[in-house]
């Protein structure tokens, strides 16, 4: 996509985030300004800039940004309402959430933290674990898993053996994110632990959304609502 527009991105994290900061400053100006403006910056030179329609409600929409590097987390702390971060385990996750929130306070801001998870939810714990083992172990495409990890810079030499095995198994099961595997009550218990660790929420993925999400919707979401971890969804009047 960058090549289509003849945009060359630096290999430097600092430069890329500096570029991103200026781009975002322009976007915020477009969203909030009712008049044309010019922009002369380090990366952009623009004339007669104006955007319409504005974001719904006349306010800047909630901003979510993923970042695990120091530069990425600084960018989110300064600009985003929510930061996505990878969860390895809940103990280190809680410490990471605390550090991110403290970082945002340094900029006079508050920020929520999200993670992402893959879900295997079945009526019983045994059913969930058996299916998880079936697709993520017995039928896993290990050469493809190793290639995917390689493309993301994750190599056996980069981690202790136990950590590499953990990541490899999670990539086979759900692109490396945190596992939620079990019956509905177990899934809710795990999500409660997310909340207690300071997370504002998590995205969820499934092997097959069409087949699996209805069960998650009907069995897990009401339990989350009953525990006060999720607001009840009310469909707007047509």
Please provide the spans of the model-predicted regions:
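Acidic/polar active-site rim loop that often engages polyanionic ligands
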Residues: 1-10
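An alpha-helical appendage that flanks or caps ligand/catalytic pockets
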Residues: 9, 13-57, 87-196, 225-238
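Hydrophobic faces of well-ordered beta-strands that scaffold small-molecule active sites
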Residues: 62-66, 81-86, 111-118, 202-205
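Alpha-helical segments flanking ligand/cofactor-binding loops in enzyme cores
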Residues: 73-77, 192
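Structural motif
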Residues: 78-79, 197
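Glycine-rich, proline-tolerant flexible connector loops at the mouths of alpha/beta enzymes
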Residues: 87-92, 204-217
